[in-house]
Regions:
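RNase H-like nuclease fold core
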Residues: 1-78, 85, 89-100, 104-198, ...
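Alpha-helical structural motif
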Residues: 59, 152-155, 200, 213, ...
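Short leucine-rich amphipathic alpha-helices used at interfaces
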Residues: 63-64, 204-205, 211-212, 262, ...
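Amphipathic alpha-helical/coiled-coil segments positioned at domain termini
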Residues: 79, 100-103, 214-356
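Acidic, contiguous segments within the catalytic cores of piggyBac-derived transposases
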Residues: 191-195, 203, 207-222, 229
């Protein structure tokens, strides 16, 4: 999977983990990393909960393994993930030679959640009309900061000026005015501006100037995304449905098949009609609650399937042994205590419905 990337000596990667069941009782976690340029899956690692101690630690274990796997083949220059605190701590303390970034979408999602919570209050209802613009402003700030944290921070905070109809100001080093063109009189009259003394403005200030958010902006300077890992995770549901138990070998095999399937379509162009017009699919995402269009890709040619079948047939004919999956030494049960004899459990069984 890394043959093309190895030609240039280093790659930027994006990573994400996926548990086999919702909540905090997962048995397996699958951690995948992709080449950021091609969106191809570079490595997939399966972690059983007994290897990490509990399900909350599995993502860090999977991340470390995936990064180590890729590091054996090529040099990793930059790593982009979600806002996982354990992964971030590991990168800042143990991988200082690599650039670390977060997916902008995850930060925007956090801001949106806070905005919706604030607008639920009657006195902050006006803020609801600005929610989409504020989130778009964070996207824009990250995309246009030129890799500078200081520029990104000033651009983000400038939303506090714009919402109260103030479009130029002093005191900053880089950003002194809004980037939009001069508003027409009609546009200015129709816009529901927020007064600086209002509860809505105070609530917005608390969100925009949140210390953790401002600190996290330094990981958004390269405007990176991990959306393609979600595409792989969605495809993985076909091969490895959640809340369905598989053996360790089964998990690894299914994840590898999903990776091959994903990579077969990663570089496909957008499909077109017979007249050469690009094809689009209309969708209504729940999070945005807006109709959007998404490109339809050309059909996959799963040539790897025929190669796999040919290899299996060839190995059977030649009595050759296929490469088997290496299974780590794992306890037969993920329970924290050894399984007792069935007879002793029956003997100690009591029911609240039949206590005697």
């Amino acid at each position: 999977m890394l043959n093309n990337a190895s030609l240039k000596g280093h790659i930027n990667v994006i990573g994400d983990g996926r548990c086999d069941s919702p909540g905090h009782n997962a048995k397996y976690l699958t951690y995948s990393m992709q080449n950021q340029d091609t969106k191809e899956v570079a490595t997939v690692n399966v972690v059983q909960v007994t290897e990490a101690g509990n399900s909350n630690r599995m993502e860090l274990v999977g991340f470390k393994r995936a990064l180590a796997d890729i590091g054996q083949t090529v040099s990793v220059k930059q790593v982009t993930t979600d806002r996982h605190s354990q992964v971030r701590k590991h990168m800042l303390e143990n991988e200082k030679d690599k650039v670390y970034q977060n997916d902008v979408w995850h930060v925007v999602k956090s801001v949106l959640k806070k905005l919706r919570k604030a607008t639920a209050k009657k006195e902050c209802a006006l803020l609801n009309k600005w929610t989409r613009s504020i989130c778009n402003h964070l996207w824009w700030s990250s995309a246009t900061c030129g890799g500078s944290y200081d520029v990104l921070k000033e651009k983000w905070i400038s939303i506090l000026q714009h919402v109260k109809n103030r479009h130029s100001w002093g005191g900053n080093k880089f950003v002194h005015k809004c980037s939009h063109s001069k508003l027409t009189n009609s546009k200015e009259r129709k816009t529901k501006w927020i007064q600086a003394s209002s509860p809505s403005y105070k609530a917005l200030q608390d969100i925009v100037l949140n210390k953790r958010l401002l600190k996290d902006l330094k990981y958004l300077t390269n405007f990176d995304h991990t959306g393609s890992t979600e595409v792989y995770n969605a495809l993985l549901n076909k091969y490895c449905p959640k809340s369905t138990h598989f053996s360790y070998e089964g998990m690894v095999s299914r994840c590898q098949l999903a990776a091959l399937d994903h990579n077969a379509g990663a570089l496909l162009p957008q499909a077109t009609t017979k007249m050469g017009v690009a094809r689009w699919n209309v969708a209504f995402p729940k999070h945005s609650k807006n109709w959007v269009v998404k490109p339809i890709k050309a059909s996959k040619e799963k040539t790897y399937v025929h190669k796999m079948v040919d290899r299996v047939v060839e190995s059977v004919k030649s009595d050759d042994t296929l490469l088997r999956i290496t299974v780590p030494k794992l306890p037969p049960n993920i329970a924290s205590t050894p399984k007792p004899e069935k007879s002793s459990i029956i003997a100690s069984h009591r029911s609240r419905f039949h206590p005697y």
